[in-house]
């Protein structure tokens, strides 16, 4: 079986989210797509999979609507369903920072293309922050990146208030899996008064796709939020499992986090 997996998001003022939810639910069901779509007044965040023709038709119909015109998305070919079912939900935020009043559609950090990221990493004045959660960072990251030690994205503002703002850095560069978290985090940092904020365009996955393994600076694997669990520097799927007891990604038969024996699992308990 050959399927196409797409991931996309956009911060855009979105009215009548319930109407959009029903339309997307009906469209995806008719096309036989699986995955998750989150809608909020701040925009859309989605990961979907289906056959090539169905994905192409979905994107064509979606982009006919002004809020989603010229939508950027990442795609990958997978051999099995990365999602078990379809979920279309309305939430207060498409990625939960706990700041629904924040408006990333108006102001975010400067996007840095993958081709320019390595040069930025060499700037000693840049404070590099991995915006992901600690269990994701445990699998891999960029050298010298700060781990905020968060268990969820909503913890990030506390890290900023307690660790970053007492001595505000002149420049901050941030990255995450696909770009959405660092885009929203960059809006938060700008609101807190940090003047120069950079974000990796398209996130780690875009960087790994654009930069050859012998030239990229990524170390380890990258956690992804589907049944692949993680990808390596070549965007191949290593043999990670999710511990059924604590939900952490592991490669051994015993979970190093909770010491429980690991049976093959594709979703947290």
Swiss-Prot record:
GO BP: tRNA modification
Enzyme Commission code(s) on record: 1.14.-.-
Keywords: Oxidoreductase, tRNA processing
InterPro entries, sorted: Acylphosphatase-like_dom_sf, Rhodanese-like_dom, Rhodanese-like_dom_sf, TrhO, TRHO_N
Domain Rhodanese: 122-216
Enzyme class: oxidoreductase
SUPFAM superfamilies documented for this protein: Acylphosphatase/BLUF domain-like, Rhodanese/Cell cycle control phosphatase
Active site residues per record: 176 (cysteine persulfide intermediate)
CDD domains the record matches: RHOD_YceA (cd01518)
Catalyses which reaction(s): uridine(34) in tRNA + AH2 + O2 = 5-hydroxyuridine(34) in tRNA + A + H2O
GO molecular-function terms, A-Z: oxidoreductase activity, acting on paired donors, with incorporation or reduction of molecular oxygen
Family per record: Belongs to the TrhO family.
HAMAP family: TrhO
Role this protein plays: Catalyzes oxygen-dependent 5-hydroxyuridine (ho5U) modification at position 34 in tRNAs.
The name this protein goes by in its record: tRNA uridine(34) hydroxylase
Species, as recorded: Synechococcus elongatus (strain ATCC 33912 / PCC 7942 / FACHB-805)
Source species taxonomy: Bacteria, Bacillati, Cyanobacteriota, Cyanophyceae, Synechococcales
């Amino acid at each position: 079986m050959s399927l196409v997996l797409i991931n996309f998001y956009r911060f855009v003022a979105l009215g009548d989210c319930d109407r959009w939810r029903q339309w997307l639910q009906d469209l995806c069901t008719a096309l036989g797509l699986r995955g998750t779509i989150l809608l909020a007044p701040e925009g859309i965040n989605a990961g979907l999979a289906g056959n090539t023709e169905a994905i192409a038709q979905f994107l064509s119909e979606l982009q006919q609507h002004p809020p989603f015109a010229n939508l950027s998305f990442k795609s990958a070919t997978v051999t099995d369903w990365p999602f078990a079912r379809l979920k279309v939900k309305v939430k207060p935020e498409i990625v939960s920072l706990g700041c629904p009043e924040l408006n990333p559609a108006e102001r975010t950090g400067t996007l840095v293309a993958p081709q320019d990221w390595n040069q930025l990493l060499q700037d000693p004045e840049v404070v590099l922050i991995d915006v992901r959660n600690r269990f994701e960072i445990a699998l891999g990251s960029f050298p010298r990146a700060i781990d905020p030690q968060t268990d969820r994205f909503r913890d990030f503002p506390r890290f900023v208030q307690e660790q970053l703002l007492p001595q505000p850095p002149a420049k901050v560069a941030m990255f995450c899996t696909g770009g959405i978290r660092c885009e929203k985090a960059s809006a938060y940092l700008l609101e807190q008064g940090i003047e120069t904020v950079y974000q990796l365009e398209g996130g780690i996955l875009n960087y790994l796709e654009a930069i050859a393994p012998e030239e990229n600076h990524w170390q380890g694997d990258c956690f992804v939020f589907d049944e692949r669990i993680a990808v390596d520097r070549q965007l191949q799927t290593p043999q990670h499992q999710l511990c059924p007891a604590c939900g952490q990604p592991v490669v051994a038969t015993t979970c190093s986090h909770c010491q429980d024996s690991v049976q093959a699992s594709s979703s947290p308990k």
